[in-house]
């Protein structure tokens, strides 16, 4: 039995709400994936987003008139699962890439981030970036290194002067 018009409208509204909260959308060809594998993907994405399987026509209606997501339209062909990411974009991309590596069945068609259509290479580059916490640790380490070098440099001036005076005094005594 097909879906009723009211049911379809409800799905479109839910998609619009999810897209409103999302920062990134990935389009994944899920052909050949079992229910267990889809559940695995959803579990991996739980912290950073959701995986939604819906008809392309319903997604097309959800993005219609929305400038942020309208560029997704060319990707809406075939059997698609939509990964809607909020929060840690890099973490979600890494979760999808890890899932693809493990399942070897799905293909990432592309995605959309900040109104820009992403190719597979763009998505791979995002996945290769360190996490937000990793970047913050690198920045903190760099700032700490500068402070340490400054402290050593400031401390070295009087020490160097003292060594030079001591050397001069030793040479005078000899």
From Swiss-Prot:
**A GO CC term?**
ribonucleoprotein complex
One family name in Pfam for this protein = Ribosomal_L10
Which family, according to the similarity comment?
A: Belongs to the universal ribosomal protein uL10 family.
* Cross-referenced HAMAP family: Ribosomal_uL10
Q: What is this protein called?
A: Large ribosomal subunit protein uL10
Q: Which InterPro entries match?
A: Ribosomal_uL10, Ribosomal_uL10-like_sf, Ribosomal_uL10_bac, Ribosomal_uL10_bac_type
Q: What does this protein do?
A: Forms part of the ribosomal stalk, playing a central role in the interaction of the ribosome with GTP-bound translation factors.
What's the subunit arrangement here? Part of the ribosomal stalk of the 50S ribosomal subunit. The N-terminus interacts with L11 and the large rRNA to form the base of the stalk. The C-terminus forms an elongated spine to which L12 dimers bind in a sequential fashion forming a multimeric L10(L12)X complex.
- What biological-process GO terms show up in the record? translation
**Keyword set includes Ribosomal protein:** yes
């Amino acid at each position: 039995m097909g879906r009723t018009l009211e049911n379809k409208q409800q799905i479109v509204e839910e998609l619009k709400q999810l897209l409103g909260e999302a920062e990134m959308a990935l389009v994944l060809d899920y052909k050949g994936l079992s229910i267990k594998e889809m559940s695995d993907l959803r579990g991996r994405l739980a912290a950073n987003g959701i995986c939604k399987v819906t008809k392309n026509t319903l997604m097309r209606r959800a993005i219609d008139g929305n400038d942020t997501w309208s560029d997704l339209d060319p990707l809406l062909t075939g059997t698609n699962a939509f990964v809607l990411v909020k929060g840690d974009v890099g973490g979600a991309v890494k979760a999808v890439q890890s899932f693809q590596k493990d399942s070897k069945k799905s293909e990432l068609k592309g995605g959309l981030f900040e109104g820009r259509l992403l190719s597979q290479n763009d998505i791979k580059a995002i996945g290769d970036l360190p996490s937000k916490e990793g970047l913050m640790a690198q920045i903190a380490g760099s700032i700490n290194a500068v402070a340490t070098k400054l402290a050593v440099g400031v401390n070295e001036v009087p020490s160097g002067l003292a060594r030079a005076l001591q050397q001069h005094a030793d040479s005078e005594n000899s």
